[in-house]
Amino acid sequence: MINKFVINYILLSYMGLCFLYGCTRAEKCNIKGHFPGSIPFYIDLYNINTGEKVFSDSLNTNDFNLPIKILPKGIYQAVFSWKRDLLRPQDIERFSRQPELGVPKYFLSTTFWLDNEEANEYNLSFDKVYNQDELEEILFNQVADEPTHMWVKSNGLNNKLYCQYLDLLDGFKHKNRHQKDSLQQVENYYIEHKMYDEAKIVSATLREPWLDLVKNELITQEILFMKKHISSDVIIQIYNFQVNSKQDFERYIKVYNSFPSNIKQVLDRRLRHFME
């Protein structure tokens, strides 16, 4: 009888400890990694849906492990910044006119899906090992449509899916940049041979963020990706980011039609004026 009582007591104690441990784990998650920027550097975390800054810190070591309070699941942007030693003429001019904006900095950001019910640990990851000089050279010469070099990864299925989507985007950004480089050579040829009307047409094309053929191909692949994973919470947020006009709604109509009726009812509150 005593042995049975002792066993039950041990089991209940164990269950209690497990419960308490589970509650402790649920209070926060962690973002960790190695960032090769100049010390000190800064990290800011934003909720993409609301634009709210939900976390901010300055770090004096390249290796970090930061506890983050429990946040609503969704897509977040992690922004890393640090002081710039190398400035362009336009940077100096901007600072002289608007010193209140502060000294120019390097910025590197990425987005990721955060859900502590899926994962409590999020790891900063780069496409290769960079030192500070290499990273700053990339950022100094970077154009807006170049692929990202940084991700925040976890074991959560939704974040893995979101990283797949980022890889899809990066592939088309690279393709867009490559084809623009080829068009730039065509423009240079026209100018060299005084074919200014032709050069003007090419120049107008190059000013657009995306080449039409590449953009259309990207949208096709986005639609296939979203339809394939239509039941994921990630897809609803991606769809919301992409559809901001009647034209967007028509472009992604196949995705909308694939959502179950309960999701459509939620989306319709925002999209109803695009459906008219």
Predicted stretch roles:
Residues I7, L12-Y14, K69, N158, ...:
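Short linear sequence motifs
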Residues L12-G16, Y21, K83, A119, ...:
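Residue-level detector of solvent-exposed, low-hydrophobicity positions
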Residues M195, I201-E276:
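Charged, long alpha-helical assembly modules
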Residues M1-F35:
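Bacterial Sec-dependent N-terminal signal peptides
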Residues C23-T205:
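A non-transmembrane, solvent-exposed segment enriched in polar/low-complexity residues
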Residues N8, N30, R97-P99, W210, ...:
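Sparse, context-dependent recognition of short Cys/His-centered cofactor- or disulfide-binding micro-motifs
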